[in-house]
Amino acid sequence: MKNEFPLKGLTAYPELEGSRFHELDPRFQRHIQNRTLRCIVILKDTHPQVKFDVFERLNSGATKLTPQELRHGLYYGDLMALATRAVKESNFLSALEIKNDKRMKAEELVLRFWALSESHDKYKKPLATFINDYSDKNRNLPQKRKDELLKNFTRILTMAKDTFEELTFKVFNSELKVESTFNSALYDAIMVGFYKIDKEGVELKATGDKAKKLLGTLIETDDKFRRSISIATSDEAQVRYRAEVIRKTFRA
């Protein structure tokens, strides 16, 4: 209205691109002056999922934010900082075969492990909302709790890497031929399954080549397990089934 800003990013009337208010046809000026400007007010006590949904709808720029980038802004606190630390201290990116992680995929996977390992039997889809709720509830943490979470992630990740070595979190067959690189559903199956074994104080049945053969055969011959890591992977039954199969398969 004060001719401060030019129109930009128009999909309708592209010929008006760059025009300021005083340069517009009078009929366009009248439309603008008579138009109601709708605002969404987000209060401090607004439900976290509502905040996430609003920001997700507004997220329409040239480079859209990932769910984790939104989560990092909405729920930032001890937990998010700890996830960043966990990625660095565990050298998680090497397991993912990622050189740089500007979109925070690794941090999301850390949160995914923490959320599923602690509330696996209470999991409800969608997965993004499940992680959001966990992030909100654990935003602020005492030092003892932070130490516990960090220790759990690094210990179980080390178990997985020591067990499957270069095939960690990859889909492969009984001949150890890789069919696809990092699979996030297989990741949480192994991490949560191993977490349960570790919590029971039981040793793993196998490591190295024997473990690889065991997992490759499972993927190749168990159709239900294969579906659980490839189709509708965030369904409650699929999430619970795949972790339990890993627990039973690798529990000594």
Report each predicted region and the residues it spans.
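Basic- and aromatic-enriched surface patches that contact anionic nucleotides/nucleic acids
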Residues: 1-133, 212, 219, 224-236, ...
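C-terminal subdomains that position terminal phosphate/3'-OH groups for nucleotidyl transfer/ligation
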Residues: 110, 114-252
